[in-house]
Regions:
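Short, compositionally biased leader-like segments
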Residues: 1-11, 104
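Zn2+-dependent cytidine deaminase-like catalytic core
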Residues: 42-126
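Short beta-strand scaffold segments in enzyme catalytic cores
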Residues: 25-35
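Small-residue (primarily alanine) positions within well-ordered alpha-helices
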Residues: 13, 31-32, 61, 65
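Short N-terminal helix-initiation segments at or just after the protein's N-terminus
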Residues: 20-25, 43-45
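Alpha-helix N-cap/loop-to-helix boundary motif
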Residues: 5, 23-25, 49-53
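Short, basic/aromatic recognition patches
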Residues: 8-22
Length: 127
C-alpha cells in the first residue's frame, strides 16, 4: 500500500466537510487526520445556536481519534479545508502532528505546527 499523499488527505477533508453541521454560518469545514498506522480519522465542524459551544473540525477529528485509542505522536498529518483557528493550532501542536495541510483562500499551504503556532504552550511549561 502506498502512503497517502497530502492532496489525497485534503480530498478526504473536502469530502467529509459536506457532513458538517453548520446551519448558522453555512461554513462547512472538514478535517482528515492521517495516523501512523495509515488510518484516516475524519471530523467536521458542529455549530450550536449558543455560538461559543460549537466545535471545530480539527477538534472533532482528534477527539474521535483519542476515543478510538490514538494518542499524541500517533499522527503524521492533518488536512483541513480552511486555515485552523488559534485553538485548533494548539490542538495540532498537542497531538504531535508532523505537518498540517490547509486551504487559505485559493492556495494550498503546508506548515508544521511550530510554524503555525510559534512559542506555543506545551506540557513542558506546566512544571
Amino acid at each position: 500500500m502506498s502512503p497517502l499523499s497530502d492532496s489525497d488527505l485534503l480530498a478526504a477533508a473536502d469530502a467529509v466537510a459536506a457532513r458538517a453541521y453548520a446551519p448558522y454560518s453555512s461554513f462547512h469545514v472538514g478535517c482528515a487526520v492521517l495516523a501512523r498506522d495509515g488510518r484516516v480519522i475524519e471530523g467536521v465542524n458542529v455549530e450550536n445556536a449558543a455560538y461559543p459551544l460549537g466545535v471545530c473540525a480539527e477538534r472533532t477529528a482528534f477527539s474521535r481519534a483519542v476515543a478510538e485509542g490514538y494518542r499524541p505522536g500517533d499522527f503524521v498529518a492533518a488536512a483541513s479545508t480552511a486555515s485552523p483557528c488559534g485553538g485548533c493550532r494548539q490542538w495540532l501542536q498537542e497531538m504531535g502532528v508532523e505537518r498540517v495541510v490547509f486551504r487559505n483562500g485559493g492556495r494550498v499551504v503546508t506548515m508544521t505546527p511550530d510554524e503555525l503556532l510559534p512559542e506555543s504552550f506545551d506540557s513542558s511549561k506546566l512544571s
